[in-house]
From Swiss-Prot:
Expression across tissues: Expressed in the medulla layers (at protein level). Expressed in all major ON pathway medulla neurons (Mi1, Tm3, Mi4, and Mi9) and in OFF pathway neurons (Tm1, Tm2, Tm4, and Tm9).
Compartments it resides in: Postsynaptic cell membrane; Cell membrane
Keyword terms of this UniProt record: Cell membrane, Chloride, Chloride channel, Disulfide bond, Ion channel, Ion transport, Ligand-gated ion channel, Membrane, Postsynaptic cell membrane, Receptor, Signal, Synapse, Transmembrane, Transmembrane helix, Transport
Native organism: Drosophila melanogaster
Miscellaneous comment text of the record: Channels desensitize rapidly in the continued presence of glutamate and are activated by the glutamate analog ibotenate. In Xenopus oocytes, avermectins and nodulisporic acid directly activate channel conductance.
Designated name of the protein: Glutamate-gated chloride channel
Consequence of changing S278T: Shows resistance to picrotoxin-induced activity inhibition
Variant or mutagenesis effect after changing P299S: Resistant to nodulisporic acid
Length: 456
């Protein structure tokens, strides 16, 4: 029994010793890590103002490899021609002065949170408008130094970048927004930026944008030459396709409905002046408001956009429907005036005919001096000049038939040949306006959709 207690006591003592040794080992390892940092970054041992040497210690330019991780794309503004992006930016280079002993593979890398302790490339974003670092809860930045002298710098930043847009096909367009990175002070003789080999740009999965779709991205080089030398530059082009469904629901369908509503006046009675005027003015004002709202969300440009063609033609159709009623009203009043004049002319002719009949009857009666009445002979001699004059008065002159008018012949094919000219205008408009609008849609969509495919 005593030997058993003795065994467990020894085992407990051994476990305490091993734990103490492990803690001491950890403390000693961190002490060694601190000692390594002091050895490579101590006072007088490293100068962050001097750039590292080239590959294999040569005097060539320092090579910095870049890669990006796009975390989110917040907004793409058409009116400001800019977009906002949040990304993790990484750059990696080799500094021979930072090599250290990895303690038999136990020390994989050293981590720094102060970037100013080592040399840093002077990279800047050339098309940046605004930008800021993230410091919640701690600054989102670190530097890793590897045993072979390789340095990895990583930081999370948010940028607002300029994105010049061509809006000729808006809203059936595609836009290319670039992100450009260049050296500010070091020329290509001292510093060269390269994309990291193998997947230099990554994008977060399930990236959703309200009005665009990120189709693809392309990496390229954009070195620039100035009076002070040639500077290394990298760029990534993000290709965005605009989501058309939003504009179909918000713009195209409402405009079509307004145009169709304006045609209702063609089916109203031409005498319903208040109804037709109010309908035409209301649709015209609504269409004008819709157009101004669309233009308010776009920058003023010197060229015609696809949406301008659509809204302009729709506004023309609505205005044309209002002018059609003005023409119908004028034709109706003109027809009424002509009818009244025709009635007055017929009344005058009837009165003249009655007066002529009375005069002819009075000529047939002749009164002598003794107030006795006698009938004049009803048949006169053929050579009698008075008989010839009466015969000429009774002659009816027929006009020669006019040549048929093709337009009148075409108009006569519509219902009610005897209907007024104003009614015919309404009947023609009921057919002409929809046909012309359908033809416009055919030309519009075939033109812009074909141009969109060409841009692909």
């Amino acid at each position: 029994m005593g030997s058993g207690h003795y065994f467990w006591a020894i085992l407990y003592f051994a476990s305490l010793c091993s734990a103490s040794l492990a803690n001491n080992a950890k403390i000693n390892f961190r002490e060694k890590e601190k000692k390594v940092l002091d050895q490579i970054l101590g006072a007088g041992k490293y100068d962050a103002r001097i750039r590292p040497s080239g590959i294999n210690g040569t005097d060539g330019p320092a090579i910095v490899r870049i890669n990006l991780f796009v975390r989110s794309i917040m907004t793409i503004s058409d009116i400001k021609m800019e977009y906002s992006v949040q990304l993790t930016f990484r750059e990696q280079w080799t500094d021979e002065r930072l090599k250290f002993d990895d303690i038999q593979g136990r020390l994989k890398y050293l981590t720094l949170t102060e970037a100013n302790r080592v040399w840093m490339p002077d990279l800047f974003f050339s098309n940046e408008k605004e930008g800021h670092f993230h410091n919640i809860i701690m600054p989102n930045v670190y530097i890793r130094i590897f045993p072979n002298g390789s340095v990895l710098y990583s930081i999370r930043i948010s940028l607002t970048l300029a994105c010049p847009m061509n809006l000729k096909l808006y809203p059936l367009d595609r836009q290319i927004c670039s992100l450009r990175m260049a050296s500010y002070g070091w020329t290509t003789n001292d510093l060269v930026f390269l994309w990291k080999e193998g997947d230099p740009v990554q994008v977060v999965k399930n990236l959703h944008l309200p009005r665009f779709t990120l189709e693809k991205f392309l990496t390229d080089y954009c070195n620039s030459k100035t009076n002070t030398g040639e500077y290394s530059c990298l760029k990534v082009d993000l290709l965005f396709k605009r989501e058309f469904s939003y504009y179909l629901i918000q713009i195209y369908i409402p405009c079509c409905m307004l145009v169709i509503v304006s045609w209702v006046s063609f089916w109203l009675d031409q005498g319903a002046v208040p109804a037709r005027v109010s309908l035409g003015v209301t649709t015209l004002l609504t269409m004008a408001t819709q157009t101004s709202g669309i233009n308010a969300s776009l920058p003023p440009v010197s060229y015609t956009k696809a949406i301008d063609v659509w809204t302009g033609v729709c506004l023309t159709f609505v205005f044309g429907a209002l002018l059609e009623f003005a023409l119908v009203n004028y034709a109706s009043r003109s027809g009424s005036n002509k009818a009244n004049m025709h009635k007055e002319s017929m009344k005058k002719k009837r009165r003249d005919l009655e007066q002529a009949s009375l005069d002819a009857a009075s000529d047939l009666l002749d009164t002598d001096s003794n107030a006795t009445f006698a009938m004049k002979p009803l048949v006169r001699h053929p050579g009698d000049p008075l008989a010839l004059e009466k015969r000429l008065q009774c002659e009816v002159h027929m006009q020669a038939p006019k040549r048929p008018n093709c337009c009148k012949t075409w108009l006569s094919k519509f219902p009610t040949r005897q209907c007024s000219r104003s009614k015919r205008i309404d009947v023609i408009s009921r057919i002409t306006f929809p046909l012309v609008f359908a033809l416009f849609n055919l030309v519009y969509w075939s033109t812009y959709l074909f141009r969109e495919e060409e841009d692909e």
